[in-house]
Amino acid sequence: MKAVVLAVAVLFLTGSQARHFWQQDEPQSPWDRVKDFATVYVDAVKDSGREYVSQFETSALGKQLNLNLLENWDTFGSTFGRLQEQLGPVTREFWDSLEKDTDWLRQEMNKDLEEVKQKVQPYLDEFQKKWEEEVERYRPKVEPLGAQLREGARQKLEELQKQLVPLGEDLRDRARLHVDALRTKLAPYSDQMRDRLAERLTALRDNPKLAEYHARATEHLKKLGEKTKPTLEDLRQGLMPWLESLKAKALSVLDEATQKLNTQ
């Protein structure tokens, strides 16, 4: 499991665009980013799982059962790889279709957000400026107290804390006033953005393409079922003999252990 966590952490820390940066490839599409993440995760699961299977086979119980788990694990990995290859084109077609059909909504929302951002930016700048002024206003009051702490003994710490509490409470109260003032100024824009979002969602709901998209999604799921059915059946057929062998050997070991207990 550590390998899985490490792989996912590396992907998030480096970003799925790392390959584009180093190799100067074209920027990845959303589907490519999802596919890369899924591939890294699945590969990590397979690798870590194979490691655990190998450890079990080398154990005393694994040698006694002789299940050939590694061989079956590799077969499973090969079958799963074929399943990924079959799903790729169909899923990408569906993703591209979804992205294309909702592109207009994304553009409108980005336009709305940019418009609101330009209107509220002066208020945000004003808030930041006032907050910096408040911090500078309290700095001369706090710095002498810090010097006293460095120069004084431990017994002065409690006295220093008492002096800091009123200053901290005063700064907190003034910050709340600025936050409340900012919230009041931004409220109309928040309501405006919420109303616009409601309008966009209503337009999306009334769009004739929505019914068409629902039909596409249904057809996509149907295609996925048709594509994966043969491969899943092959996987099931391949695992059944191994599962039956596992069951038989486990029962054999259990019977042997029971007989030993009865003879004691």
Swiss-Prot record:
Protein name: Apolipoprotein A-I
GO biological process, one term: triglyceride homeostasis
Gene designation per UniProt: Apoa1
Record's signal peptide: 1-18
Classification via SUPFAM superfamilies: Apolipoprotein A-I (SSF58113)
Any one of the GO CC terms: endocytic vesicle
Quaternary assembly: Homodimer. Interacts with APOA1BP and CLU. Component of a sperm activating protein complex (SPAP), consisting of APOA1, an immunoglobulin heavy chain, an immunoglobulin light chain and albumin. Interacts with NDRG1. Interacts with SCGB3A2. Interacts with NAXE and YJEFN3.
Entry's localization field: Secreted
